[in-house]
């Protein structure tokens, strides 16, 4: 069953908070043009991954966004973005919605959120030859320990807070930067 009211509420919450009229006009535009634009990074498997051979997106977020578009009886258009501008792209009108944006107070000042549809667990990882160096979070927070996380994500702020003594590198594009 198509529940347009719930979908409309979800879109209203994901659009910039410039007022109800703005959100309603965005919803009207989506329905009248027949296109829901979704910002995605394509570098966050298994949630959003761009297949370089076909240029198609796949993953859990992609499936959720496709189902939303299907329920709204509109087409989905994926718009490439990056983590540091994910929410800004919604505010700027580059796209209507996104997925996998963790809730942050700073982001909530600019954009709304739907109900949470997944939870993540934060894990540190390293190569097998270095495992013996680390017996907990405190052993990571030391000078000379190299850490890395993705620029513009919740993990950037957490890494800076949890590991201020480590040598932190910010990676702009995970698919390229962690290799």
Place the predicted regions along the sequence by residue.
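Bacterial N-terminal signal peptides
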Residues: 8-16
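Extracytoplasmic small-molecule ligand-binding "clamshell" domains
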Residues: 24-101, 109
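Short Pro/Gly-enriched coil loops immediately N-terminal to beta-strands
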Residues: 112-126, 142, 161
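Sec/Tat signal peptide C-region and signal peptidase I cleavage site
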Residues: 18-23
């Amino acid at each position: 069953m198509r529940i347009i009211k719930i979908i409309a509420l979800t879109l209203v919450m994901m659009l910039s908070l410039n007022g109800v009229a703005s959100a309603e006009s965005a919803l009207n535009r989506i329905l009248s043009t027949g296109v829901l634009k979704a910002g995605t990074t394509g570098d966050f498997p298994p949630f959003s991954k761009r297949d370089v051979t076909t240029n198609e997106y796949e993953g859990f977020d992609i499936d959720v966004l496709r189902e939303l578009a299907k329920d709204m009886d509109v087409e989905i258009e994926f718009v490439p973005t990056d983590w540091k501008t994910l929410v800004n792209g919604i505010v700027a009108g580059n796209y209507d919605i996104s997925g996998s944006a963790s809730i942050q107070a700073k982001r909530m000042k600019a954009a709304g959120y739907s109900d949470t549809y997944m939870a993540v667990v934060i894990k540190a990882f390293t190569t097998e030859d270095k495992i013996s160096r680390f017996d907990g979070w405190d052993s990571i927070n030391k000078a000379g320990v190299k850490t890395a996380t993705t620029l513009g994500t919740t993990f950037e702020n957490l890494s800076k807070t949890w590991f201020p003594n480590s040598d932190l590198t910010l990676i702009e594009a995970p698919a390229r930067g962690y290799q």
